[in-house]
Every structure is written in C-alpha cells, then in structure tokens.
Amino acid sequence: MQALNTTKRLMSTKQFPLFKSLLYSSHDPADCTQVLKVHSYTPKVGADESILLRTLAFPINPSDINQLQGVYPSVPEKTLDYSTEKPAAIAGNEGVFEVMSVPQGERRLAVGDWVIPLYSNTGTWTNYQTCRDAGTLVKVNGLDLYTAATIAVNGCTAYQLVNDYVQWDPSGNEWIVQNAGTSAVSKIVTQVAQARGVKTLSVIRDRENFAEVAKELEERYGATKVISETQNNDKDFSKDELPVILGPNARVRLALNSVGGKSSGAIARKLERDGTMLTYGGMSRQPVTVPTTLLIFNGLKSLGYWITENTKRNPQSKIDTISALMRMYGDGQLQPPEADIKKIEWDVQKMNDEQLLEAVKNGIQSNGKSVVVLKW
C-alpha cells in the first residue's frame, strides 16, 4: 500500500489541454505557405513542472516569413517533441500569452498575467505553449492586446535605435533621418524621438496621396517633417530646401535605414560629420550604398542592428526596453498600433484546421501588418 501511495504522489496531478500549432519541417523560398501545416498534439513535458500559457495574439512578421523560406540567419531547432513523423518547429517569434497555470512554488508569475517571450525562436503560432523558466518571459500587464503582441520586435527595435547609439541633447536642434517612414518601426521611432526632444525627418515613397500620408505621420505619429524619396535623392533639394526645414544649428546625428539601395546613400549624405547610420532592414533587397567620401572624410559610422542578437548578448537590455516602453504607453506618449493592423481571427472552438491554415496563409501573403487574434 505504501508503494502504491508513493506512485500516486509521483503521477502528474495536472493534464494539458490539446495543443494545436502551425508547424514546418522544411523550407520553400518561392512559396513559404506550402511548408506550413496544422498539427494537434499533447506536450511530452510534465504538466506539474511547466508554466502553461494560452495564446492571445501573435503577429506575422517578415522574420517569421523569412524563417519559413529558409533565408533567415536565426532559426529554431526542429525536433520530434510535437509527435510528428519528421523533426519540426513551430512557426513564429512573437506573441502575447496569458498564464493559465504555474508550478508549485513559482513566485515570479501568477495565473492571469500577460507575458511575452524574451527570446526569439520560441514558436508562437500556437494555441497553447509551455515554458519551464519564468525568467524567459516578460510580464506586460496593462498593455492593450495589439501593443503587447508587437512590442517585442517593433517597439523594442524602435526604442533601442533611438536611445542606444547617440547621446542626445534635447536642448539642441538635433535630428534623426529615416527611410521607410510609413513602417511600424518608423512610426514608433518618431514618437520615441519626440518624447526625447529629438526631431525626425521621415522619408516615404512617392505616391498620389503623399500630402495625406505625410500629414498623418506628422500629426498622429510625431514626425517633424516628411519628405518623398524623390526629394531625398535630389541634390538641389538637399542644398537649398533641406537647410530651411532643419533650421539653424541643426545636427543630423543619426540615420536609420531599412530600405537600402539609393535611399540608404541619400539619408547617409544628410548626416553631420561623425554621424551614425544604422541598418536594420533591407526592403528594396538592394545593397547599402554609402559614398566612400563619407566614410573617409566625414567619419561616417555605418552599423548593423538586430534585436535578436542584441537580446542574446544582453537580455536585461530588452527587459529594460520593454519596461520603458510600457511607461511611455501608460503616459500616453505612444499611440497603440491597432489602427495600422489587419486583424485575423482564430476562433479556437469553431475553426477547423483547413480554415486556420488558410487564414494564416492569407496573412502571410497580404500587405501590411497582420495579427492573428485567438477567440476563446
């Protein structure tokens, strides 16, 4: 009888719900949607020792798509942990989760907390997730759903770009110049910079409704001035009109590049001596073109930025960044991103596997920012 009682105590007292995840075992650079499949399973880890998370929402980011294509430098390990025939990984790097249960003795988290993963490659395109270490999760209680789902990539990237490379003098006439001014990161950059007393010159593509878009970027998102790519590449504009826009004693100290090609060289030319250009993306798929004279005679520093690698080197920096952003959202200094997001609903109770897969595929193939929101 004693042995039987001992056996009962050792058995798990909790059971996992059925997990459903979007997995991939291979890659396809031509059509990454073909490698995704929906798979249901029960985790192999012990329920009593694991933190159980219920997914609330996850975005579809360019880095997620690049991982499916097999062209991203950071990828999760494919394993047999999900009871698949071939080693597989769960797609997705970002999302917000609700804590459903915690192991006995866990004091850092409580049931009902909203959390996000500290690191990439955790597999967020799923209805449930388990975690063994509460230290790899960051609490984001108090944020709205869309901010919480996207703060780890776009929010942290924008904040660190503005704050980690230049010591700003808010009493001076100091500027950031950036291309891709309509991107989610750029919109946060202008708001973070405005809160720091730093001005921003945002470059956007030429378009028929340029004036309308520029007005929104300036009035809603805090850009000091918006110009077109044509103006950005026009030497006469830079010589005659740009000084008037910048004002007296202006210092363009930082350039943020996520386009590459001609656009990157044009924003680099606007920097003061010993200025810094940070490249964090390459939308044009063209190489960064920086004039040799800027490097030799102007002391230009051209650096790369990658939030994934920064977090690996210094995890606390991301935790601190999230805390700072949460304070800014709480103080009303940052606009929630919901207005710029395409919502995709995953009705957990009603949608079958085919419907879920089709919805996510549509999100991958659509323009703009898509966030999958789970309806429980």
UniProtKB/Swiss-Prot annotation:
Disulfide bonds: none
Major place of residence: mitochondrion
Reaction catalysed by this enzyme: a 2,3-saturated acyl-[ACP] + NADP(+) = a (2E)-enoyl-[ACP] + NADPH + H(+)
UniProt signal peptide: none
InterPro entries assigned to the protein according to its UniProt record, in alphabetical order: ADH-like_N, GroES-like_sf, Mito_Enoyl-ACP_Reductase, NAD(P)-bd_dom_sf, PKS_ER
Keywords tagged on the record: Fatty acid biosynthesis, Fatty acid metabolism, Lipid biosynthesis, Lipid metabolism, Mitochondrion, NADP, Oxidoreductase, Transit peptide
GO cellular component: mitochondrial matrix; mitochondrion
Catalytic site positions: Y72 (proton donor)
Binding site for NADP(+): 154, 182-185, 205-207, 280-283, 305-307, 369
UniProt EC number: 1.3.1.104
Compartments where found: Mitochondrion matrix
PANTHER family found in the cross-reference section: ENOYL-[ACYL-CARRIER-PROTEIN] REDUCTASE, MITOCHONDRIAL
Subunit structure as annotated in this protein's UniProt entry: Homodimer.
Function according to Swiss-Prot or TrEMBL: Catalyzes the NADPH-dependent reduction of trans-2-enoyl thioesters in mitochondrial fatty acid synthesis (fatty acid synthesis type II). Fatty acid chain elongation in mitochondria uses acyl carrier protein (ACP) as an acyl group carrier, but the enzyme accepts both ACP and CoA thioesters as substrates in vitro. Required for respiration and the maintenance of the mitochondrial compartment.
Name of protein: Enoyl-[acyl-carrier-protein] reductase, mitochondrial
